[in-house]
């Protein structure tokens, strides 16, 4: 059905290409609050971004880090601390228009748990930067 519809659309005969409209992430730390609804609930989103040498190997490394962080933060924030139902993590290696990456971590929690859970998140990041990644977590990511 879609093919029939799309196939019947007229062609404009023009060639199109993408255009860089200059959208970029803000510099530094940005904190925003929005108050909506009646029930108190917080949504925490931490985004890291920066320059990135785009390659298949680097994209794989970024994806593997995404998998490790997903497991570690689920274990700590959800299972150990009981502070959230789930942690969502996604990493984006970006090739065009500029080579960069974005690494997103997001979770919902009660407003009174925001600081505690955010500190635990950054403690895990510091731990990985200082001590590296335990081989058990690498094995778990490879099993996925």
Predicted regions and their residues:
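M16 family metallopeptidases and their MPP-like homologs
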Residues: 1, 41-55, 78-144
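An aromatic/glycine/proline-enriched structural segment found at the starts
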Residues: 1-42, 48-52
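Active/ligand-binding-proximal structured segments within catalytic/core domains
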Residues: 46, 56-72
